[in-house]
Regions:
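A short, internal acetyl-CoA/4′-phosphopantetheine-binding micro-motif in the GNAT/acyltransferase core
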Residues: 71-78, 106-108
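C-terminal "cap" of GNAT-fold acetyltransferases
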Residues: 119, 132, 138-189
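Short amphipathic alpha-helix that is part of the acyltransferase structural core
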Residues: 1-30, 165, 172-188
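Conserved acetyl-CoA-binding loop of GNAT-fold acetyltransferases
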Residues: 122, 127-134
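A structural signal for short, well-ordered beta-strand segments and their strand-loop junctions
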Residues: 46, 100-103, 133-135
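A conserved beta-strand-loop-helix scaffold within acyl/acetyltransferase catalytic domains
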Residues: 15, 23-75
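Conserved GNAT acetyl-CoA-binding A-motif
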Residues: 94-118
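Conserved acetyl-CoA-binding loop-helix of GNAT-fold acetyltransferases
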Residues: 79-95
């Protein structure tokens, strides 16, 4: 079950799990996270099974489009199918929206074969659930190169349209866009 959590629990979640689950360059600092949480710029959700919190994610909504960030299964529940059930629940939870966007590290970010394998498995995880990799978008956030994967509830968008949606979402949440570089390989007509 997906449950939206309040500010205090969201801040506790950061300290308890996010710091361990995400490298420093892939998560906001605690100060930035607290500011976003207090200002209601994003929503924090936990995913529970049998009354236990087994996973969590952050979502940001703009014009019926959802960006999912920092999705993670809590370490002791990994390898038990929780991630698949979580992703299916998220897809169902947002079924009245236009699309879901997720960011997955680009294969360029791998420093070794083990990291490359993890990145490939992460992409496959999303694609097996129906997400499509949006090729032709260059997307770098806080110096991390990402691939964009999209689950469409509506007609597929062009790279330019999707790029504009992502810029719009991040502009609302993080108006200082110095650390976001995103562009489409399509020409604006």
């Amino acid at each position: 079950m997906i449950i939206k959590i309040k500010e205090k629990e969201g801040l506790e979640l950061y300290k308890k799990y996010m710091e361990a689950d995400f490298p420093e360059d892939e998560r906001p600092s605690y100060k930035e996270y607290k500011k976003l949480t207090i200002s209601n710029k994003h929503d924090i959700y936990k995913y529970q099974e049998n009354g236990e919190t087994v996973a969590y994610f952050i979502s940001i909504e703009k014009h019926n489009n959802i960006l999912i960030t920092h999705l993670a299964v809590i370490k002791r529940y990994r390898g038990m199918g929780v991630g698949k059930r979580l992703l299916n629940s998220i897809i169902n939870f947002y079924k009245n929206k236009n699309l879901l966007i997720v960011e997955a590290e680009s294969e360029k970010m791998a420093n070794n074969e083990n990291e490359l394998d993890i990145i490939k498995r992460r992409k496959k995880y999303y694609m097996n659930a129906g997400f499509e990799e949006q090729k032709g978008i260059k997307y770098i956030l806080t110096d991390v190169d990402y691939s964009i994967l999209v689950y469409y509830y509506i007609t597929k968008l062009t790279n330019i349209e999707l790029t504009n949606i992502i810029k719009s979402i991040y502009n609302d949440v993080l108006p200082n866009m110095d650390y976001l570089k995103i562009e489409s390989d399509e020409k604006d007509i």
